[in-house]
Amino acid sequence: CAHACYNVGNQTEDLDLAEVYKSVDMFFSKMDYINEFVLIGGEPLLYKDLSKVIVYIGNKYRRKIGIFSITTNGTIIPNEETLKVSQKYQVLYRISNYAKELPRLRQSHIKLIKRLQEFEVDYKLYDEDGYWIDYGFDYLNNDMDEEKLIQTFDRCLTPCREVRGNKLYFCVMARSVSDNLHFNEGQDDYLDLEQLNDDNYKKILLEFNLGYSEKGYLDMCHRCHGMDAANYPIPIAEQLV
C-alpha cells in the first residue's frame, strides 16, 4: 500500500500472476454470475500486472459479473494501458476518501478523476466523513464456547468472500488478519472449489455462502467484535509516521 495506516496489517505479499489466474479460473468454473467482483489490496494499482489481470478477467468472465470493480485509496494514477482496458471492460474504480486525515489527497483525487474521465472510466469517490471500525483482531482473544462462537458468526454473516487458488474463504478479514498477524488460525476455514465435482455442487456453494458449515463458525470469530464492531469507531487512515 502507498500509506502506512495505524490498525492496518502491512505484511501481505503480492500474489504472483499465475496464482491470480488460477484463483479467477477456479472461482468462475463454479459460478454462474456474481453481483460484484472486486480487485483489492493493499493498493491494487501498485500491482505491476494489473492490466493483464483486468484483460484476463474481462475476456473470459465479464459476462458473469455485474459490477467489476477496483478499490483504490486514490494515491496512484493508473498507467495508460490499465486505463484503456478498464474502459474496455467497464471497470468501476471505488476511491476511498482519506482526505480529512490526509488533506494532500484532495489533489491526488483531482488528478486521478481527471484521468479516469479522459478514458471514460466509471468511478465513485466516497465522502470524507467516513470512519473505520475496530474489529479487535490485534487484542481480542475471547474464551468462547461453541454456542457463543456460533452466535457471533450468525449475527455477523459478512458479505465479503475471498478466493485464493482453489480456496473460497467466507470472511476475507479472518483469512487476511490470521495470515498478516501470524495467528495461524482458521487454516481449514474455506471451501475447496477443486473438490466440488458432483452434480450437487451448487447446493453446497449456496449453503456455504449463506453461512452453513459443519462447525457453524470460523476459528477467528473469537478474536473479532463481529457485528458489534460498529460500536468501536476509529480514526480513518491515521498514519504511523
Report residues per predicted region.
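Conserved SAM/AdoMet-binding glycine-rich loop
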Residues: 6-7, 20-95
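Conserved strand-turn element in the central/C-terminal portion of the radical SAM core barrel
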Residues: 95-102, 121-152, 157-159
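Basic phosphate/pyrophosphate-binding loop/patch that engages nucleotide-derived ligands
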Residues: 105-125
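Accessory C-terminal segments flanking Radical SAM cores
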Residues: 140-241
